Amino acid sequence: MLCLGLSGRLSRVYENSFDLPNSFMHNGAAVRVRDGRVIAAVEEERPNRIKHSNTLPIRSIQYCLASAGVQLSDIDRIAYYATEAYCNAVLERVRLSHPSTPVSDARLLQRARGGRHGLYIPVGHPDVPCDRHRHTDLAAHWTRDGTMPWRLSPALHRRDELENVGPGIDC
């Protein structure tokens, strides 16, 4: 199984489209894992040369894919370090403080931002159902208002693998 893990905000370098708190997007990074073993991992500050870069890890993703000679469509699972509920809560907070913010839904934001780079993955599409990730020690996050449950990380799974993962959640 080939997996790609991501962290970082959804803005490009030198772009701050959405005024998100720093707790929402720590340093941008990508990691490629095959059958439970880390094969490639790159923090976005390395390829873009901006210390503590928390941007969408485009170059890191490109490296992780190119180093294996694979395309995004070859990836079995993609994980992000925060739950959809947490992302939506942060985006709603931003929208309330800045009414001109165009998007307050994580899926729509991912479609708008990721699609520009050929990284859009149709969450909720029948071929890409959503399930809670069970190995969550890597994503032990919390918020003061309790919008994000401890140690939860979403992971996208292909439909034929869900039997091995357990019950899914409605995405």
Curated annotation (Swiss-Prot):
Alphabetical GO biological process terms: biosynthetic process
Signal sequence range: none
Database matches in InterPro entries: Carbtransf_dom, NodU/CmcH_Carbamoyltrnsfr
GO molecular function, one term: catalytic activity
Name recorded for this polypeptide: Uncharacterized 19.2 kDa protein in syrM 5'region
Record organism: Rhizobium etli
